[in-house]
Design a protein with these regions (language model features):
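A glycine-rich, hydrophobic/aromatic-adjacent loop/helix-cap motif
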Residues: 289-399, 549, 558-561, 570-580
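Long, contiguous, secondary-structure-rich segments that constitute the structural scaffold
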Residues: 484, 490-549, 616-631, 636-798, ...
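Flexible glycine/proline-rich, aromatic-decorated loop/lid segments
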Residues: 208-211, 441-478
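Glycine/threonine-rich phosphate-binding loop and adjacent beta-strand/alpha-helix elements that clamp
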Residues: 163, 461-483, 496-498, 702-703
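N-terminal export/assembly segments and adjacent metallocofactor-ligating motifs
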Residues: 1-241, 251, 270, 278, ...
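Rossmann-like nucleotide/phosphate-binding core characteristic of flavoprotein oxidoreductases
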Residues: 722-933
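Long, low-complexity segments enriched in small/aliphatic residues
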Residues: 352-353, 358, 518-617
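Glycine/threonine-rich flexible loop motifs
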Residues: 179-188, 415-425, 465-468
Length: 933
């Protein structure tokens, strides 16, 4: 068989890295970074470098949606359906819903992980064919505040900077972002810039001391929700010190005097009160941002990087505009190394913004409220008109479904039963909607449980089209292998449904086909034409040019290539060419803490996982860095609450409860709790006292949203934390064949609701095998039939199985050992009742140590093994599988300064030599070794 290499793009974050996909015999065998792609120049993070493992046929057969499925009853089993029958069913249901209830009774919820061409046809289907604006995207949850902020100040939704600016900046102002974990390849470029220019100043604004903050020269640990207070305080300092650029303000902006008066309230004392930032730190941040240094003339450039910490707030738009004001006030825009640079969360959130797939936008950044814009789009699409009334944004869409206004929900490439806030509301909506369609590549998301119709879509490695990254760079996405089963491209599914619906709608039946496309290129050509004369004009590009290399927009007809930076001439995308100073209002979070809910929950990402884990969660090695769901608290709070590491605690907000193990960390203020946004009920489950299934971390978050952007405040909620008294536990681990492990996990997921608390995660490495871990707890012993079922699912039975049961004390244990030469290895273990022995059994099993001398001890309670065991310790480097024990052992022999010791670690163990995501942790370990020496 011949191996081939296909150029494509990574499907994870908005950095937009280029990848080279090696395939052989219809199987993806390896993924490498594309050295010619300007976003990453060959680098990949831990997630991108393991993409080929997500495409393993053994995995795909277990987790993918491979054929259309239909439920005759919502609670029943989904049964296979032919494509024609599925399309006819959906087409008829849509037409009937429109005829009986109007077009606004159909709601479509799409995704920033769709390709631009998929996005375009979804948007045209809703606004052009059905005549409704009831379509929104999960990009509403991450980027709509950035959109609103850019439009309000600069006139267009267009990030003005580029990645190259990282190398030119004298100051980096990173706020509401943790690129070390969320945008790792951007962080590698930040590290490069710091090495090349040791004088580069890095300011990080984040309530937590993250890996990004570890690199900072100044960490501003502001209180959640106080961003505008900080930026106004900085602007006031700049005014007082004469650091603003009055010439730039006079020549290129409007509204300065009113804003200058408004920020006078943000005194250093007020900023300290609201943000917790000392006056000296505030002044330092203002000076560095302004680029004014004592003893030198001119102004050094400042680049700001920001993400969900700004956007996911009830003041999200104000956070964005207040930050952009700092750039405008100092002329820090439109030149190398300067500008407000929004880091996009998803791989094609930018593409969705470009095609107008938001409930209040139209194609090519057109405004729904502008009659001329609506007429332009209607003419392009060949329809009489597009509706003027904005549709319902993401949370509103599900509120309307819960209220019975929306009868049919079509959900594509996203998992709202995990990712939307206030999960109790979301699940009411999914239950009440009369017909729910889930179009997805994966069958494992929580939303799929509510679907009446499931449509199998293609995903990374199988798709053709384009995506746009954070720096406005359009990349080609290419298929390396054929789609598995009966999966279809998203654009094809929409087009086929549209061809069935159009003849059934009286206002559209007489028109020529609105969806005559035969492939993504034809769709892209129509999208390109929609951009003519707009701020994102790409009429100078062709599909062939994109095939040759990624291109930035704008690139209007007549230009040879796109523009790296915007507003270099000081003219902005407003009618008069002047940027706008608006009046953002300083505020606080939607839910301040109080006596009843005294803790501030902060959510965020993990280093090696992505979104709802549908893709990244199938890679066993990506679980090593964070092996199970936890809630992190400050050590003093854990002591005060009587919590030890690993204890279970109830986290309760006004909307719901999550039960999770707790873990102490040093990077949080007292009164704050951090929990990763990845933990949905697919991996973190259990049931309430009434038997209701717990819904993961977003059971806690609030649907309160920014009034301008309608983006919800997913970053913060007021909660209380109470120690859980669940004395009877279950702990199970087992190695399983790759071809079975994901089906086993899905079976265990169905059993988790039998416990008040349960979690189910993967462990292992591709070269050593894959396994499952189940952890659960209850008030009292469960029926032994349930334990037998767990053991059966994990293969802990038959030859080599050892068992112990004490029904009176509620103790139950089972182990299975397999002969491996002269040794015996532990294939699987279930502990029930007293589970303290997991402390030594887990490394025994996961590190494949000889268990033969411990056969009898496996069935005994206790935290200590009868013989001394050594453990690899916690994983540090996911790429090379290097853990703490090896690192600390080598550090004892290392010599020299911190940089030399870090290099010796890299040379000796290869940790930190691949994606680099573990380097901040390695640096902390090096520093600790120097301190203790």
């Amino acid at each position: 068989m011949t191996e081939s290499t296909t150029r494509s793009a990574c499907p994870y974050c908005g950095v937009g890295c280029g990848v080279l996909i090696d395939s052989e015999g219809g199987r993806i065998t390896r993924v490498r970074g594309d050295p010619e792609h300007p976003a990453n120049f060959g680098r990949l993070c831990s997630k991108g470098s393991t993409l080929h493992l997500t495409a393993r046929p053994e995995v795909q057969a277990q987790v993918r949606l491979l054929q259309p499925m239909h439920r005759a009853q919502r609670a029943g089993a989904a049964l296979p359906l032919a494509w024609d029958q599925a399309l006819d069913t959906l087409g008829q249901r849509i037409a009937t819903t429109v005829q009986q209830h109007g077009a606004n009774a159909v709601g479509m919820y799409v995704s920033g992980q769709l390709l631009t061409e998929d996005y375009y046809v979804f948007n045209k289907f809703a606004k052009g064919l059905l005549g409704t604006n009831q379509i929104d995207t999960n990009s509403r949850l991450c980027m709509s505040s950035a959109v609103a902020g850019y439009k309000a100040t600069l006139g267009a939704d267009a990030p003005p900077a580029c990645y190259e600016d990282l190398a030119h900046a004298a100051t980096l102002f990173i706020t509401g972002a943790n690129p070390a974990w969320a945008h790792p390849i951007v962080f590698r470029r930040i590290e490069d810039a710091k090495r090349a220019n040791p004088h580069l100043r890095i300011i990080v604004c984040d309530p937590r001391r993250t890996d990004t903050a570890e690199l900072a020269d100044l960490h501003l640990a502001l209180q959640p929700g106080s961003d505008v207070w900080l930026y106004h305080g900085m602007l006031r300092c700049m005014l007082e010190q004469g650091w603003v650029d009055q010439a730039f303000i006079a020549a290129h902006t409007q509204g300065w005097d009113v804003l200058a008066a408004q920020v006078q309230h943000a005194t250093p004392a007020a900023v300290q009160q609201h943000c917790g930032i000392a006056p000296a730190e505030l002044l330092q941040a203002a000076r560095w941002f302004a680029g004014v240094d004592a003893g030198r003339t001119g102004r050094s450039p400042t680049l700001s990087l920001y993400c969900q910490g700004l956007n996911q707030s009830v003041h999200g738009t104000d956070n964005n505009t207040a930050l952009i004001h700092l750039h405008l006030a100092c002329g820090q825009i439109g030149k190398p190394g300067a500008g407000p640079f929004s880091l996009t969360g998803q791989p094609n959130a930018m593409g969705g913004r470009e095609v107008g797939a938001l409930a209040n936008q139209l194609s090519a950044h057109r405004n729904l409220s502008d009659p001329q814009h609506r007429a332009e789009v209607a003419a392009l699409w060949g329809v009489p008109e597009v509706p003027a009334t904005p549709g319902k944004a993401a949370v509103e869409l599900f509120e309307a479904a819960a209220d019975g206004q929306i009868k049919l929900l079509w959900i594509a490439c996203t998992n709202p039963a995990h990712s939307l806030p206030d999960q109790a509301l979301v699940r009411r909506a999914l239950q009440r909607a009369e017909f729910v369609v889930v179009q997805d590549a994966y069958a494992t998301g929580a939303t799929a449980r509510y679907a009446d119709l499931l449509l199998p879509a293609t995903t990374w490695g199988e798709k053709e089209g384009t995506v746009t990254n954070s720096e406005r760079r359009i990349s080609r996405v290419r298929a390396a292998v054929a789609a598995p089963g009966q999966a279809w491209a998203d654009w094809r599914i929409v087009t086929e449904v549209a061809r069935r619906v159009q003849p059934l709608l009286p206002t559209r039946a007489h028109l020529p086909s609105l969806f005559p496309y035969d492939g993504p290129e034809a769709i892209w050509n129509e999208h390109r034409e929609s951009t003519r004369g707009r701020d994102l004009d790409i009429t100078g590009l062709s599909w062939a040019q994109l095939d040759a290399a990624p291109q930035q927009w704008p690139c209007p007809q007549g230009q040879a290539q796109g523009r790296a930076r915007l507003y270099t001439d000081g003219r902005f995308a407003t009618p008069d060419g002047r940027a706008r100073f608006v009046l953002p209002q300083p505020g606080t979070v939607a839910e301040p803490t109080d006596a009843r809910y005294p803790f501030a929950l902060i959510t965020g990402r993990l280093r090696d996982q992505w979104h709802g884990l549908s893709r990244s969660g199938t890679v066993e090695s990506l679980w090593a860095h964070a092996s199970e769901p936890v809630a992190q608290l400050a050590r003093e709070d854990m002591d005060r609450l009587g919590l030890a590491p690993g204890d279970l605690a109830y986290l309760t907000s006004r909307r719901g409860t999550v039960l999770a193990p707790v873990q102490p960390v040093d990077g949080l203020r007292s009164g704050q709790v951090f929990m990763a946004m990845h933990w949905g009920d697919e991996v973190l489950g259990g049931a309430s006292s009434t038997g209701k299934r717990l819904a993961g971390v977003n059971a806690l978050t609030t649907a309160a949203r920014c009034p301008q952007s309608l983006q919800p405040e997913l970053k913060h909620a007021a909660i209380k934390v109470l120690k859980a008294e669940l004395p009877w536990g279950v702990w199970a681990q087992a190695w399983l064949p790759l071809a079975q492990v994901h089906l086993a996990r899905q079976t265990l997921e169905g059993l988790m609701a039998a416990f008040p608390f349960a979690s189910c995660t993967l462990f292992g490495r591709p070269e050593t095998g894959v396994g499952l871990q189940l952890r659960a707890a209850a008030h009292q012993a469960v029926d032994t039939a349930l334990l037998e079922r767990i053991a059966q699912v994990l293969g802990i039975q038959g030859q080599g199985a050892l068992s112990y049961q004490d029904a009176r004390r509620g103790q139950w244990r089972r182990a299975r050992l397999l002969d491996e030469g002269a040794a015996q290895l532990l294939q699987g273990m279930v502990l029930a009742g007293d589970v303290s022995a997991q402390a030594w059994i887990a490394p025994l099993l996961q590190e494949r140590q000889n268990a033969q001398p411990l056969r009898r001890a496996l069935l005994q309670a206790g935290t200590r093994p009868p013989v001394r065991l050594t453990s690899r310790g916690a994983a540090v480097c996911a790429c090379e599988g290097v853990a703490e024990t090896a690192i600390t052992g080598l550090l004892q022999r290392c010599v020299g300064d911190a940089a030399q010791r870090l290099q010796q670690l890299k040379d000796g163990l290869r940790c930190g030599t691949q994606c680099g995501s573990c380097v901040p942790q390695l640096q902390r370990m090096v520093q600790a070794s120097l301190t203790s020496a």
